[in-house]
């Protein structure tokens, strides 16, 4: 599971060989959420404050998230994304 960024203590990653639609995962304090890159719809249990943070960050970095999704799906090298909001 390649780590793309760590945003205010929230680990952002995409799993190898993951299912469609394109999405990423965020992990914080034992909680894990999957977020659709296109719709930004979250699935999973995640603290509300951290969910707001990661959704705001993802909106700013949507193109980079999708680019990384495509790279990882093609088994190519991904790149890190800035944690800046």
Task: Name each model-derived stretch.
Residues 8-11, 43-47, 51-55:
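Short, charged low-complexity linear motifs
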Residues 11-13, 34, 80:
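Generic structural signal for residues positioned in beta-strands
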């Amino acid at each position: 599971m390649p780590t793309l960024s760590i945003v205010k203590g929230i680990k952002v990653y995409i799993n190898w060989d993951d299912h469609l639609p394109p999405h990423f995962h965020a992990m914080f304090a034992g909680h894990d959420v999957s977020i659709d890159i296109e719709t930004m719809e979250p699935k999973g249990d995640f603290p509300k404050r951290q969910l707001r943070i990661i959704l705001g960050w993802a909106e700013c970095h949507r193109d980079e998230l999708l680019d990384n999704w495509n790279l990882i799906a093609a088994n190519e090298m991904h790149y890190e994304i800035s944690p800046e909001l």
